[in-house]
Amino acid sequence: MIMQKILLATSNRHKYLEFSRLLYPLTLEALPEDLKRLLPNETAKSYRDNAKLKGMALSEIYEGFVLADDSGLEVFSLHGEPGIFSSRYAGEGSSAQENIDKLLKNLQSKNITDRRARFVCALVLVKKKKILFETTAFCYGIIADRQKGGGGFGYDPIFIPEGYSLTMAELDEKQKDLVSHRGKACQELKAFFLENRMEGHS
């Protein structure tokens, strides 16, 4: 089989860098500027369906592998919020800091002491409009009282994974990759490529 790259269906630079690290030695291709306009709005009601929307849309015009994900944070005592709206929790175009501020404010204003939560990552691999692989992985933990750490992105500074006393943003990359939702999903994808002897290298 001809070796080929995997197009990552995201315009998020942080996600591209993290997935590139997690999927090594598979080779990811960043989404070109002229294709970013083809990314559909995340209008589905589940992570997996949102990932499928993005993967199938790009597969319409890209002949190789397309990898799409949708991720989010769910706080159990907030009935799963922010959930599929994690990236825009504080409104359309909101920053990661604004989303964090809103979440911490909600927990504080409602005097919530049960801060259990989980990260979710739905991953879908598409080629020629056919779904070849899909999985959903989780990382359980709690929401910290305040932000800590300068690593990672998104809600990492306020999420403490099970078995740790540090936030995701305080963990080094190796530690984070072992426990994170994306790390677990990517391990499954790499196993799929290996089991099916498929090529995703440059």
Curated annotation (Swiss-Prot):
Role noted for this protein: Pyrophosphatase that catalyzes the hydrolysis of nucleoside triphosphates to their monophosphate derivatives, with a high preference for the non-canonical purine nucleotides XTP (xanthosine triphosphate), dITP (deoxyinosine triphosphate) and ITP. Seems to function as a house-cleaning enzyme that removes non-canonical purine nucleotides from the nucleotide pool, thus preventing their incorporation into DNA/RNA and avoiding chromosomal lesions.
Record keywords, A-Z: Hydrolase, Magnesium, Metal-binding, Nucleotide metabolism, Nucleotide-binding
Family (UniProt): Belongs to the HAM1 NTPase family.
Residues that, per the record, bind Mg(2+): D70
Organism whose genome encodes this protein: Methylacidiphilum infernorum (isolate V4)
Co-factor binding comment: Binds 1 Mg(2+) ion per subunit.
Protein name: dITP/XTP pyrophosphatase
Cofactor(s) annotated in UniProt: Mg(2+)
Gene Ontology terms for molecular function: dITP diphosphatase activity; ITP diphosphatase activity; metal ion binding; nucleotide binding; ribonucleoside triphosphate phosphatase activity; XTP diphosphatase activity
Keyword Nucleotide-binding tagged: yes
Gene Ontology CC annotations of this record: cytosol
Pfam families recorded: Ham1p_like
Catalysed reactions, as listed in the record: XTP + H2O = XMP + diphosphate + H(+); dITP + H2O = dIMP + diphosphate + H(+); ITP + H2O = IMP + diphosphate + H(+)
SUPFAM superfamilies: ITPase-like
EC number(s) reported in the record: 3.6.1.66
Superkingdom of the organism of origin: Bacteria
Broad EC category: hydrolase
Listed transmembrane segments: none
GO biological process assignments: nucleotide metabolic process; purine nucleoside triphosphate catabolic process
